[in-house]
């Protein structure tokens, strides 16, 4: 009997340990991102979508949901002020997309560069940003700008790749296909601690450029 109990308890602990992993190549907590009926304690979860949305998300778009956790912590990729960006951990800072003039150089005031040119234009209405207003596809490639978001590159349901990046196969519900594998790299272990530095930074081993080429040729 004791042996049976040990086995059962061991199995239970293993399941619990796996379930505690939100994105860590394990079981994501569904209700962290999704809501079945857009209702919680008698209140709307997503007030902007009273009838819900196609993905049963807790916010309008996948990127909105991602940023509810990752904007100010767990990577801090979207600051509140483009003039005071967050400490860099890698991707972002997407707040530069909201800047009215990116040109800080000589004559910048008369040669303005809109924030639309800051980088990856993710669709996140809650942060005041949307699809690229100029480009219809990724520079050098053919990824549709209209569908770009956090989950275009990162798998929200978890995988074993660096930063949950997609490998070879379909992305965005099959609307685009990656032909290069995810890169091999070691990232900063504590993304809520100190930011990038000469001694604390991501180490890229192989495949990063090829992976970027999935979208950029």
Pin down the residues of each PLM region.
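Positively charged n-region of N-terminal signal peptides that target proteins for export
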Residues: 1-4
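Hydrophobic helical h-region of N-terminal Sec-dependent signal peptides
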Residues: 6-14
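N-terminal signal peptide c-region/cleavage motif recognized by signal peptidases
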Residues: 16-18
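A motif-centric signal for short, conserved binding hotspots located
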Residues: 20-217
């Amino acid at each position: 009997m004791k042996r049976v109990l040990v086995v059962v308890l061991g199995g239970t602990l293993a399941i619990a340990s796996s379930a505690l992993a939100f994105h860590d190549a394990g079981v994501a907590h569904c209700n962290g991102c999704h809501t079945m009926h857009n209702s919680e304690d008698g209140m709307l979860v997503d007030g902007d979508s009273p009838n819900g949305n196609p993905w049963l998300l807790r916010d309008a778009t996948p990127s909105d949901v991602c940023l509810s956790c990752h904007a100010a912590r767990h990577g801090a990729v979207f600051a509140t002020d483009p003039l005071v960006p967050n400490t860099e951990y890698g991707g972002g800072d997407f707040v530069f997309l909201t800047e009215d003039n990116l040109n800080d150089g000589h004559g910048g005031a008369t040669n303005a560069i809109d924030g639309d040119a800051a980088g990856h234009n993710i669709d996140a209405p809650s942060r005041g940003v949307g699809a690229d207003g100029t480009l219809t596809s990724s520079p050098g490639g053919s990824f549709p700008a209209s569908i770009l978001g956090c989950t275009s590159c990162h798998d929200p349901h978890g995988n074993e790749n660096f930063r949950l990046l997609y490998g070879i196969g379909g992305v965005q519900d099959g609307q685009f296909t990656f032909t290069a594998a995810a890169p091999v790299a070691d990232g900063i272990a504590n993304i809520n601690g100190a930011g990038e530095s000469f001694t604390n930074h991501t180490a890229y081993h192989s495949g990063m450029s090829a992976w970027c080429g999935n979208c950029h040729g």
